[in-house]
Amino acid sequence: MTAPASNITADKNAFFGADLAAADRDIFDRIGLELNRQQNQIELIASENIVSRAVLEAQGSILTNKYAEGYPGKRYYGGCEYVDEIETIAIERAKALFGAGFANVQPHSGSQANQSVFMALLQPGDTFLGMDLAAGGHLTHGSPANQSGKWFKPVSYTVRQQDQLIDYDAVEEVAQASKPKLIIAGGSAYSRQIDFARFRQIADSVGAYLMVDMAHFAGLVAGGVFPSPIPHAHVVTTTTHKTLRGPRGGMVLTNDEAIIKKVNSAVFPGLQGGPLEHVIAAKAVAFGEALQPAFKAYAQAVIDNARALAEALQTQGVNIVSGGTDSHLMLVDLRPKGVTGRDAEHSLERAHMTCNKNGVPFDTASFAVTSGIRLGTPAGTTRGFGAAEFTRVGQLIGEVVNGLAANGVDGNGAVEAKVREEVLALTARFPIYN
């Protein structure tokens, strides 16, 4: 039985005309709650940031309708004229931003960017060398729980116990002993600058490719306040959010034409099908923002604020891994306080400061508990916090942690309530999306 035309017209009008509030109240309400959380909590998770309305608008655009398997000018679908132009803009902006010869902006995430390099340059069972997860590496750098640790043969390097810094001589010793085909520099919880030239020297000495995962510090590189790996690495991977302040996604950069051809084939058709062109458009917008002079000031402020936060924590008797930071993030070692990372994360969240529990070098606690927390300044800097605000944030974190040490998990409610009131006053001074 054919539906009456009037019903079809009504359904069509509702489909194209109803906003989210009218169409799906369950989701609309929960997005509103999440907006309230972001507005009224201080975001200290080092891998998170706050994007512009322009980035949100691009990602929420009608480009979500378009399938575009392949690459600009070489698609497997018709109707790709405009998404070709958008993806080309994203590629050219990425190349200009990082001074790279080639870019692939299609990876859906940093993990898939890393996977694409593995697929492009390694065979299953090949040996590669990466930073141990407990020392600040990443799951995709050889964790046995990750594909990288299941399909390939990972060997790891760590940090020195006395200062928690990379020991490059030790890295070279491991490389000479294991003869990896690929060496990875970069990680998810290492706060110091990395000597990329030394890593390249080590890679060359054993005939290995050097891959730098700059997911965490890409925005600092783009802003000119952190050393660039592009002149030294055979290939560089990154996310496009974190310090780069774009949508959640990944990217691969290189100056080697042979490598980009292999990476392109690995991304599509090797790992992915159709690219997310609405996300690629948002990446292009974020890259355009990062090419503006204001972004350099932002990147410098991120580092200045991180140093202010670390110094404030240290004055509260809180231990910072490696003694400080050169970047946007820091690891807090809570073992001297007798506090776990899990308890600190939960207590700080009740005080409206969001961070994540994190293992510290040579940690004996489980990943579910940990002995530390990881803190970062990108999101707070985006909302306008300066060194004075982050100094106060450090003092407030110290109050919560010291309260936990003195009062225990169940006795810290009064401290959390006091800190929460000050946090709410602080976030009210620096509103977002208002």
Swiss-Prot record:
Coiled coil: none annotated. GO terms for molecular function: glycine hydroxymethyltransferase activity; pyridoxal phosphate binding. The modification N6-(pyridoxal phosphate)lysine is found at K242. CDD domains: SHMT. Pathway: One-carbon metabolism; tetrahydrofolate interconversion; Amino-acid biosynthesis; glycine biosynthesis; glycine from L-serine: step 1/1. Belongs to the SHMT family. Homodimer. HAMAP family: SHMT. This is Serine hydroxymethyltransferase. It comes from Caulobacter sp. (strain K31). The lineage of its organism: Bacteria, Pseudomonadati, Pseudomonadota, Alphaproteobacteria, Caulobacterales.
